[in-house]
Amino acid sequence: MLFTTFVSLLLVILCLVHVSAHPLQSFRSSSAIGKQKHKIKSRQFEEEIAQGAEDSIELFEFPRVHDSSEQIHERTEQQNITTKNIILAINKNSRKHGGLHRLPAQVQGEGEFTYDRQRNAVGSYRYGDSHGNSREAEYSVADHQSASGEYKFGPTT
């Protein structure tokens, strides 16, 4: 009886030593693994969006969510992104698409005009967040503008 008690006590001690020698994974380490998986999924989603946006016009590449500030600064320097360059690009684009051309004040004239503008656009929209929610939609826009009339311009008397 004494021998059996001694052996069972020895087994219990060995089991406790064995369990304490292999600690369970802490919450922090499993949380870090989850964050890495989320980061990878976010990168993949960003790359999918970038591949799908080939037809869009961008002034510069936006920084990714998980890039360090140093990487963002390097990209900003490489692409020469300054306020002046952004304003120049906006002005160039507005001049390119602007429909109004001003004439000098000394010019006189009169006449008729007609204006006809059509616009069609088709695209898709994708959205995803960190909780795994996603939304996808397609859109189509058709627009037609027209006008006609008479004009007179020049110095008024």
UniProtKB/Swiss-Prot annotation:
Residues 128-138 have a biased composition (Basic and acidic residues). Residues 1-21 form the signal peptide. It is found in: Secreted; Host cytoplasm; Host nucleus. GO terms for biological process: effector-mediated induction of cell cycle reactivation in host. GO terms for cellular component: extracellular region; host cell cytoplasm; host cell nucleus. It comes from the Eukaryota. Effector protein involved in the induction of tumors in infected plant tissues by the fungus. Required for the reactivation of plant DNA synthesis, which is crucial for tumor progression in leaf cells. Interferes with the MAPK-triggered phosphorylation of maize SGT1 at a monocot-specific phosphorylation site, resulting in both modulation of immune responses and reactivation of DNA synthesis during leaf tumor formation. This is Secreted effector protein See1. The gene is See1.
